[in-house]
Amino acid sequence: AASDVYKRQSVDCVVIGFDGEQLKVLLVKRAGEDNGEVYHDMKLPGSLIYMDEDLDEAAQRVLYELTGLKNVNLMQFKAFGSKNRTSNPKDVRWLERAMQSRVERIVTIAYLSMVKIDRTLDKNLDEHQACWIALKEVKTLAFDHNLIIKEAMTYIRQFVEFNPSMLFELLSRKFTAAQLRTLFELVYDKVVDVRNFHKKIAMMEYVCLLYTSPSPRDGATS
């Protein structure tokens, strides 16, 4: 109920996936009417929190309600509290209609999850109006959600510098060196030197190299 909602605090979830070729982000469709015109755009899975739940509970609930995903590993990575977050009248009107309550300034806590894109994950997305969009194809989103995604990628790059194992959340247990190299190139948005990259893989304690015929260069497993 709207009376149970804490109107100044929300959570937004950035769920990043990898399909073997490109990085994707999980978005939900948004439809509304503004000044008599119907519009359709997209947003991150997010909403206001309830008075009787903590932030982590809210993030799990919102992600499940909007996408059907549950038991996903979510971690807080940043708070977004710009005074201009709710300055767009279209966003404010949409949120007030959705929550059936007047909305003022809102601070959001952003959560990040890295997941494998597979059929099990995707089985409930359509009925929840959720879908995977390639990062390079993301258009203008609601509120400051483009900025939140940008900051999520910055966080991932900084984290991976010290702990590359984070990226293995995006891969199956067995993967090729080429797939891992592609993933690094997408995350850092630059071409990776093949020879140096293979040396880097060989030094990773949590990677077991599997050489398969006829080509021994691409076999690897985590």
Feature roles, as predicted:
Residues 179-187:
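DNA-recognition alpha helix
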Residues 188-213, 217, 222:
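C-terminal accessory regions appended to core domains
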Residues 3-42:
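N-terminal strand-loop-strand
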Residues 44-52, 169-170:
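Short histidine-centered catalytic/ligand-binding loop motif
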Residues 11, 57-60, 64-119, 159-167, ...:
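Active-site segment of metal-dependent pyrophosphate-handling enzymes
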Residues 1-9, 211-218:
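Conserved small/polar residues in nucleotide/adenosyl-binding loops
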Residues 108-117, 121-158, 170-178, 196-197, ...:
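NUDIX/MutT-family hydrolases
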Residues 163-174, 187:
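Conserved helix-adjacent loop modules within structured domains
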